[in-house]
Structures are given as structure tokens and as C-alpha cells.
Amino acid sequence: MIQLSKRIYTLLGVSLASLGIVFLLLAATLLTMVPLSSGFTERSAKAAIIGVLAFSLGIGLTLRQTKKDRHPTRTSLIFGILLPGIVGWLIFAAIIYALQDDLLFSPRTLSLDRATTVSQQFPQAQEVYIKSDAATLHGWFLPASNSKPAPLIILFYGQGGEASRYLRMAEKIPEASWAFINYRGYGWSTGTPSQDAIFSDGVTIYDHFAQHPLVDEGRIIALAGSLGTGPAVYLAANRPLAAVLLFSPYDSIAGGVAQDLIPFVPTKVLLRNSFNVMEYAQAAQSPLLAVIGDADQVIKPVRSYTLVENWAHTALQRVVPGGTHYSIYEDDETWEAIRDFLLKLAITTTN
């Protein structure tokens, strides 16, 4: 009975210490994700407090029971300390694996009120439904002011975006028509997002608009940011885009961006959706302009530089001094550089 009681206390101690390790790893991970949201700072602090308390209590119980043994060995002491670390790490890795899709994709819904607001603010916007395999993609086509075939800019946004939030961006290049289409599972698009689905959908969107009477098929551009640069790079390798404009591009998510944000587990092995776009960059058929913030802590500049260096076609980069993952979109000089880039390629005729 006494022996059973000792085992229960030891098991309880190891379990608490393991839980503490999980929370400490979570706290450290949330801290690396603060550039995504300042709210992670408070969550990280709370997780750290829980982790320290649980680990301290667990180790205390484990060592107390070990010392009560008549013949405690160094091995049992080391085992009592190392086991929680191993178990805690395995649990944390399992959590990351189980929640990987929730971490990678953050679909925003589209309310009826929001859709009504879009129609009021942009009366010229045409709602679009595009069939892509078993899914139906929803979004808007915003034609240029003239009635002739015009350049088209297809937007690919980041992981927490939603197409209706970006229509105002069309004011930056009014000479072009714009396509704002939601990924699967985002807005009113059906289906579930994944790497293969989003990549395939990008090609479907291109093919749909290439036949549109108000689109000049020879002047279709992909403009993408963050997560969305992946499908844009894939599209550049599979369709003859006139140009590619990328904000904060990456070489790989599983082996790069995710590893930077979650350095405690091998994300390259754990993540099903790798978003490794290097092979597509090396097969790109279009000129590139990459916009990179040198203070970007979400997608580190080295990730962007690697992609640019491996781009098969002409590649230019604009580095925004002090630019963060979000502020680079508000830089007026960047949009000036983009308009100049398109003008030199004869895609547009005005700057």
C-alpha cells in the first residue's frame, strides 16, 4: 500500500512537471509570435506563470519521493528530472501537430452586413462565384474605369485575411482591374483551406479571368502578401503572368517561417502543408518585385532574400527601412516603386 502511494505521488509529480514544461514551451512560443499580435504578450506571461508553478510543484513532489527511498540512486534522480522534460516536449509537439491547420489558416467569415457595405462603397464591384473542383470560390471583380480590356491584378492575401477587406487597395493602381477572391473556407467560399487547394485555386482564378472580356490576358499580375505569396509563386511557375508583386515573401513555411516562430519542435517534419515554394520560384516565368521590411519579425527578411535570389526570371527587391510585416503596405514610396515597375514593363501607361 505504501509502495502504491509512492508511485501515485511520483506519477503526480512527473505529470505536473511535464505540464509545466508544456506551458513553458507555450509561453516561449507565444513570445516569438508577439509580432503577429500584441495580445500574445499577456498570454505568454500567464502561460509562463502556470508553467513555473506546475513544474516547481511537480519536481518538488518527484524529488521528495525519490529522497524517501531507502537507496536513492543518481539514475533515479536524473530520471525524475529528465522524464518530465521529455514527456512535456512530446506533448507540446503533439499539440502543434494536432492544431497545425488552425495555426496556419485563420479563416475570416463574411457577414451579410459586411457584404452590403462592400456593395455600397464599391457599386462598380461585381460579385463573382468560381467553381474549383468541389469548392465554390466567392469574391469580387473590380473593373478599371474604362470599358476596354485592362490589366488585371489578382490579390492573394495573408492567413488571417478576407477579400472584402482589401478592395480599397485598388485605388493604388486604378488603371488596372482587380480580382479579390477568397480562399476556400474564407468569406463565402466553400471548402477547407490547404496548400494544394489554395495553389490549385490560384490557377483556376487565373484561367477564369483570362477569358473575361474586360481583362487583357497578356497583362495579368499577381499581387500577394505573407501566406498568399505561396500561391502567387506557384501561379508564376504555371501561368504566364505579366508581373509578380510580393510583400514579405518566404522560401518555406514548414522549414522556414514556422521554424522561426516555433523553434522548439521540428516544424519541417510536423507540418503537412509545407508551403515550400523554392522549386516554383526556380521555374517562375515572370518578372518579380519583392517588398521586404527590414524589421519584419513575422517573416524574417532572410526568408524573402532567399526567394528573390532563387527567382528564375528578373527579380528586384525593395527593402523598406524600419518596415514591419504590416507597415510596408502603408509606405507611399513602395507603391510609387510598384507603379514605376509596371510602367517600365509596359503593363500600365501611367505612374
What are these regions (language model features)?
Residues 12-64:
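Membrane-embedded alpha-helical segments of integral membrane proteins
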Residues 134-208:
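Membrane-embedded segments
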Residues 323-333:
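Catalytic histidine-centered segment of alpha/beta-hydrolase-like enzymes
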Residues 169, 277, 286, 300-309:
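Short alpha-helix in the alpha/beta-hydrolase fold that links the catalytic acid
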Residues 295-299, 325-326:
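Acidic catalytic loop of the alpha/beta-hydrolase fold
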Residues 208-212, 218-262:
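Primarily recognizes the serine-hydrolase "nucleophile elbow" in alpha/beta-hydrolase
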Residues 284, 290-296:
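Short beta-strand/loop motif that positions the catalytic acidic residue
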Residues 23-40, 44-45, 85-129:
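An N-terminal hydrophobic leader/cap segment in hydrolases
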